A protein has these predicted regions:
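Transmembrane helix boundary and interhelical loop/hinge segments in multi-pass membrane proteins
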Residues: 30-54
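Short hydrophobic, aromatic-rich alpha-helical segments embedded in or entering the lipid bilayer
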Residues: 150-204
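Short amphipathic alpha-helical coupling elements at transmembrane boundaries
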Residues: 43-51, 124, 159-162, 175
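Short hydrophobic alpha-helical segments within the ABC transporter permease transmembrane module
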Residues: 45-46, 59-68
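Residue-level recognition of transmembrane alpha-helices
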Residues: 21, 40, 49, 63-64, ...
Length: 208
């Protein structure tokens, strides 16, 4: 009979929840921040930039870098709060795990900034801004497997979602957040089949 401590169970659930939160937050916050570019077009602020002796490339680079900086600040604070939650529920991460998650966060913010810049570039009105913000905020978590593991979807949908980069980004951050949990399970000599099944269920082995 296998006995699993409440701390390990709570730590596993907390790590999965915080990983999903960070995976979604790094993209949705970035989208919301980058919508400033659309806001400037809609309210006419962009006209002031256009008459300034600054190239369009530098203007767009400024939007991109400001999006990255603001998103990193917001998501950095979210990450600190997530670490506090993990500390309360069940802490199994080491320093290397924390650094890897920080790297994942930066990678996701850069991906989100690039994606949001491409999508926001042709938008010019408040209505378009609201529509994109709503769609991304509501739908991204499902598409990347954060709200519900992709392993729970049907084979066809799993195959379709496997072509999206966000799927693997979410899996990456889950692997690093849950690495300490799986290490503890192996230390306690839990069956390999059980640990592997948990990995598969939580999309830590993204093979679709």
């Amino acid at each position: 009979m296998i006995t699993i401590s409440d701390k390990l169970i709570n730590g596993t659930v907390a790590a999965q929840l915080t990983a999903s939160l960070m995976a979604v937050s790094c993209i949705t916050v970035t989208f919301c921040v980058n919508l400033t570019m659309v806001q400037d077009k809609a309210n006419g602020t962009r006209k002031d930039f256009n008459v300034a002796p600054v190239s369009k490339e530098k203007i767009y680079l400024g939007y991109f870098l400001s999006t990255v900086a603001n998103s990193l600040m917001v998501n950095g604070l979210a990450f600190v709060l997530c670490l506090g939650y993990l500390l309360k529920m069940g802490w199994y991460m080491n320093a290397a795990d924390v650094l890897w998650v920080l790297f994942d966060m930066i990678l996701l913010v850069l991906f989100g900034s690039t994606l949001s810049s491409i999508i926001s570039f042709p938008l010019t009105t408040q209505g378009q801004l609201s529509a994109v913000g709503t769609i991304v905020s509501a739908g991204y978590g499902f598409l990347c497997g954060a709200y519900m593991p992709i392993s729970n979807f049907g084979p066809g949908l799993q195959k379709a979602l496997s072509y999206l980069p966000s799927t693997y980004a979410t899996s990456l951050i889950k692997n690093h957040m849950l690495h300490g949990v799986f290490r503890e399970m192996e230390r306690k000599n839990y069956p390999d089949e059980m640990v592997e099944a948990i990995r598969d269920t939580l999309d830590c082995n993204p093979v679709f």
